[in-house]
Each structure stands twice: as structure tokens, then as C-alpha cells.
Amino acid sequence: MTSTRKLSVSCLIVFMVSSLIAVSSGWLSIGKIAIKDGKCDPKNGNLYAIGEKWYNDEDCFEITCVQGDKGSVAQQVASCPVHAVKPGCELVFPGGTYPKCCPYYECPNS
């Protein structure tokens, strides 16, 4: 195998592995949240200490109260992976609490 072909195969393998990691791991974001008594206040009637989690089942999120910059608190939101369209398959939204609520494809003959 030539060195150019080896490089092409190596690049393809790296691309495929990184694509699988990106698809299987969903996404995370960190954002501002109201603070009350040093805790996260998502305005749902509850206060959450740093490290505590709560769930938004409607949007399929897991939210964690985290330590922000300079003593502030923030919310870290985890959500489901984004799926590419799979022709001939049906995207299923199972409901439930994150991560069980994450959509998935149901394909015939699979």
C-alpha cells in the first residue's frame, strides 16, 4: 500500500470515529440562570445546589447547577444527539426522562 493510500485510509478512519463520537454523545451548553440564596432558580418552584440535576422532559434535557465564574452559578444543559436523516426509517420520540426520551431511528430490516 502506498503512503498516500495509507494516509487516506487513516484520515477516513479518524473521520468515521469522530463522527460516531459526535453522534452518540449529544451536546452540552452552559448558560445563565437566575440565582436565589446561592442556588440555581429555574423558576419551576425548586432551588438546586451546585451539582444537583433536574430534568425538562418536554424538551428532553438534563440540567445541572454548576459553579460559574467568580462565585456565580450557571446551568449546564445536556441534550440528545442530532441524527442525520435515514431514508426509509421512522424517527421515534419515545418520551420519558433524559436520556430515555432521546429520539432514535426505527428502520425496517434492522
Curated annotation (Swiss-Prot):
Key words of the record: Disulfide bond, Secreted, Signal, Toxin
Keyword Secreted attributed: yes
Post-translational modification: Contains 4 disulfide bonds.
Organism: Ethmostigmus rubripes (Giant centipede)
Example of a GO MF term: toxin activity
GO cellular component, one term: extracellular region
Compartments where found: Secreted
Family assignment from sequence similarity: Belongs to the scoloptoxin-16 family.
UniProt-listed InterPro entries: SVWC_dom
Pfam family name, one: SVWC
Span of the signal peptide: 1-26
Tissue expression notes: Expressed by the venom gland.
Listed name of the protein: U-scoloptoxin(16)-Er7a
Chief place where the protein resides: secreted
